Regions:
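Short, well-ordered beta-strand segments
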Residues: 8-10, 77, 95, 125, ...
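Ordered, amphipathic secondary-structure segments that act as subunit-interaction surfaces
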Residues: 72, 77-83, 197, 203-208
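Paired acidic/hydrophobic, glycine-rich loop segments that form the ligand-binding mouth/hinge
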Residues: 58, 75-80, 164-169
Length: 327
């Protein structure tokens, strides 16, 4: 019989997912709480040879974990926050967001160590449309190759010569103890990361106050506010985790700043619009920290919309619809 005072924590089966979950579990166990780790396979893991966009819809790395939560198989699920859709599953809560690791994209070069020193025609591998567009905007002379697989697989393929460099999230390399492979950090305003990149989230059932209370010590208030701003911006644009939108919120003292960009490819060229605002604006004075974060997200989204973001999104969705029909 299961110990009713223990917590069953669900995780994906990849090395990175298990490392992230083990970090969470170690902190829970330090509080004297027993933990059982339950591995759950997701659609994104099972179809690792297919580009994410071709699998279809947001949430390909989280749906099965959410189902395990809903059915009571697990009490909490550990996710990479950037994998979560902007529309939350009913009855589930993003209750706990630990302190964020580095949010930046990075380059791992085989010989050349930076984008600037890669020779013309070099091949760069990435699994992200956002990264691909930002890369092509900066170096249109490079060849972009879609890659899938876990971090270790990508590094082995790079070492075997499949590409001259790869782009991925720096946090994943750091968490796996592979930060030494990073040859260049790609930060804003050149490269805006995915919404929530570098952050973990512990998802629980909304009505499970007991588990939420036990795990509350892991919540990092500053990170939580930054994520609220980023996800509010994304939701206001009706974007999902597969849409080429980048955003990053940062704190300096009591001031929260949010920058975001949206990218579109049309007629072979990449268009990028970006906006940066902060809570020093008179429009958010006198509000609570949470209200400031969400209002800031809406304000940045509104500015992007003024610059043409909705038209760009509509154009992308129309193009995707045509591809689906032709496929």
């Amino acid at each position: 019989m299961r110990d009713v005072d223990s917590i069953r924590v669900g995780t994906r089966g990849s090395a990175l997912a298990k490392t992230q979950t083990e970090w969470v579990v170690a902190h829970i166990q330090q509080q004297g709480i027993a933990v059982e780790i339950i591995e759950v396979s997701t659609r994104g893991d099972l179809r690792g040879d297919i580009p994410i966009r071709q699998i279809g819809s947001d949430g390909v790395f989280v749906r099965e974990l959410e189902l395990a939560l809903q059915t009571g198989r697990i009490d909490a699920a550990v996710h990479s926050l950037k994998d979560l859709p902007t529309i939350l599953t009913e009855g589930l809560s993003l209750a706990i967001i630990p302190e964020r690791a580095t949010p930046y994209d990075v380059l791992v070069g085989k010989t050349a160590r930076t984008l600037a020193t890669l020779p013309t025609g070099s091949c760069v591998g990435t699994s992200s449309v956002r990264r691909e567009m930002l890369l092509r905007l900066e170096r249109p002379d490079l060849v972009v190759k879609p890659i899938r697989g876990n971090v270790d697989t990508r590094l082995k393929n790079l070492d075997a010569g499949s590409c001259d460099a790869i782009m991925l999230a720096g946090a994943g390399l750091d968490r796996l103890g592979l930060g030494g492979r990073i040859t260049e950090i790609l930060a804003p305003p050149r490269f805006w990361p995915a919404v929530g990149q570098g952050a973990l989230v512990i998802q629980v059932r909304t009505d499970d106050d007991v588990t939420k209370s036990k795990l509350q010590f892991l919540n990092h208030a500053t990170t939580h506010l930054e994520i609220m701003a980023e996800r509010t911006c994304l939701a206001s644009l009706a974007g999902g985790c597969l849409v080429p939108i980048g955003a990053l919120a940062t704190h300096a003292g009591q001031e929260l700043t949010l920058g975001a960009c949206i990218l579109e490819e049309r007629d072979g060229s990449i268009r990028k619009i970006e906006v940066t605002l902060s809570t020093s604006s008179s429009l958010v004075q006198g509000l609570s920290s949470e209200q400031k974060a969400t209002n800031l997200g809406r304000m940045v989204a509104a500015r992007l919309i003024e610059e043409g973001a909705l038209e760009m999104l509509a154009s992308m969705r129309a193009a995707e619809g045509k591809q689906a029909l032709s496929g």
